[in-house]
Each structure stands twice: as C-alpha cells, then as structure tokens.
Regions:
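Solvent-exposed serine/threonine-rich low-complexity stretches and specific carbohydrate-binding patches
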Residues: 36-47
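Beta-sandwich interaction modules
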Residues: 46-69, 74-75
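Acidic/proline-rich low-complexity IDRs
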Residues: 23-25, 42, 56
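Short, surface-exposed beta-strand/strand-loop-strand elements in extracellular ectodomains
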Residues: 16-36
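C-terminal interaction-tip segments
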Residues: 1-8, 14-19, 65-67, 73-93
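A detector of low-complexity, intrinsically disordered, Ser/Thr/Gly/Pro/Ala-rich segments
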Residues: 26, 31, 51-53, 88
C-alpha cells in the first residue's frame, strides 16, 4: 500500500448556498473528533466563494498511514448545491 501526503485542499462553492463548514481529516472516523491527532483542517466556505488549507511544502504536509483514507465531512446542514473539492497530494511508499 501507499501513503498519501496532503499538499493542499481547496473547496469551491460556485452558487449561492450559504456559509458552510467542511472538516478534513485522515482515517475513516465519523468526524474530526474521532481521532484529533489525524485532524487536518476545518474550512470555512463563504457563501458563493472558496477556501483552502494552507499549502504544505513537499514532505511536510499531513501524512496518512498505509492505505489510510482522506475523509471530508460537512458540519451542520449539508449544502444543496454542487461544490468542487480539489485535493493535491503526493504518494509515498
């Protein structure tokens, strides 16, 4: 199996749908509080806007275990419009 290392994650809301919070973490827990050590970020997505994690340098971003999932979850009411989620990462052996 491979490990992923997060470089940057961006969430884009192209239509008016209210402010949203999106949590990003490693693992398959129900939410970011399942294992706080695996938390990456909570993004505050403005109405009709976008937000991103900070950009990590190569070999410095959060790194998952072998075959570990990268998970994201909406906090509160999920959006009713389409959102784009762009994940930039590298794979490591």
């Amino acid at each position: 199996g491979r490990r992923i290392r997060v470089l940057r994650v961006q969430v884009i809301q192209e239509q008016t749908d209210g402010r949203r919070l999106w949590e990003l973490y490693l693992g398959t827990g129900a939410d970011i509080t399942t294992d706080p050590a695996k938390a990456i970020d909570i993004l505050d997505i403005p109405n009709d806007g976008e937000a991103a994690t900070r950009t990590f340098l190569r070999d410095e971003g959060p790194r998952g275990e072998r075959d570990e999932a990268l998970s994201g979850r909406w906090l509160g009411t999920p959006p009713t419009t389409v959102h784009k989620i762009i994940v930039e990462y590298t794979e490591e052996s």
